[in-house]
């Protein structure tokens, strides 16, 4: 059974930082590209970026969060990370990790991030 479990969310002040984690199991993590997406309250799902696998150099692609957010992975532990810096109120959302980069057949339940003073 494929499982993805996000953690690390919470309340943070504007300008602050958070690191989200996504623990995975049930598939060969090293084989897959992995993505982060988010859904702000009452809004549509927004793709943030992805990281390729080792075979493709662990290279990354980002949306408009490039420069503030960094995706990384630990293949030995099967964990995906999202480092978020200089957070803004508009970054408040539920954040999800997903396997692959287009058809998100597998993703987690999400972790809520609230950016507020």
Curated annotation (Swiss-Prot):
GO terms for biological process: immunoglobulin mediated immune response. InterPro entries: Ig-like_dom (IPR007110), Ig-like_dom_sf (IPR036179), Ig-like_fold (IPR013783), Ig_sub (IPR003599), Ig_V-set (IPR013106), IgHV (IPR050199). SUPFAM superfamilies: Immunoglobulin. It holds the Pfam family V-set. Keywords: Adaptive immunity, Immunity, Immunoglobulin. Transmembrane segments: none annotated. The keyword Glycoprotein does not apply. One of its GO terms (cellular component) is immunoglobulin complex. GO terms for molecular function: antigen binding. Signal peptide: none annotated. Residues 1-113 form the Ig-like domain. PROSITE patterns: IG_LIKE (PS50835). This alpha chain was isolated from a myeloma protein that contains one light and one heavy chain per molecule, linked by a disulfide bond. In contrast, normal mouse IgA molecules contain two light and two heavy chains and lack a light-heavy chain disulfide bond. This is Ig heavy chain V region MOPC 47A.
